[in-house]
Amino acid sequence: DDKPRAASAMARDASRLLVLNRATGEMGEDEYRNVADYLRPGDCMALNNTRVIRARLHGHKDTGGRVEVFLLREETPGLWIALVRPSAKVKPGTVVRFAGGVSAIAGDVLPDGRRRVRFDPPNVLDILESVGEIPLPPYIRRDTPESGDLTRYQTVFAHRPGAVAAPTAGLHFTDEVFAALDAKGVDRAFLTLHVGYGTFKPVATEVLEEHRVDPEEFHFPEETAESSMRPAPRAGASCLSAPPAPACSKPNSGRVPLSPVPAPQTSTSTRPTP
């Protein structure tokens, strides 16, 4: 199937937009570049500004064996939770060497099969720009990354590095779409949810609510919550997020207050359900 490959080359805002008229129940299709047509002055869009990191590293042992390290989460500077392949052939204490003089020591295998990996030097996020690869989502069926992947699978407003997969709902926005939203009087607010490896986990349960989601780190600024609770300039204005799949509803039912979290940085395993 060539559709996933073709989709990656499509203009961002040419993606299809599913439109539901909540008053009539009628559904239709449009393109995302026209999303401003379905919003009203004073509406506020909450957007995830996470930035995808080059989480996949290819290295080798001193014996010459190839090793792949897929970074998941940084615990302390230089110490990461990661997937190591082939795990059975990488014993605890094994040194893995990467390009640019970067090395890492593999720790014990954790109960879930993951490993702690300590890097030298410890400034891993800076190192990734030169030695890492961006992880391709499973629906992109090719073995190796292409030069445009890091741009294509990054939102135009990506800011805080830490995700191993793009927040796909945000990929449809362009500067032109934002210009149209600005002209319409639609506000924007940003929060951060670092999309983790669990997003690739298939649903293996009959009951959706029984599907367990890996915790993901998020940062919810107080100013974002305040933006959602600020009095709207006109009746009926709403606060809405970029949905998991392109969708838009109208008319909206009213501004939705969002509460700031007690800590600036924490994690969640909450999942949206229909």
Locate predicted features.
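Surface-exposed, charge/polar-rich loops and edge strands
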Residues: D1-P274
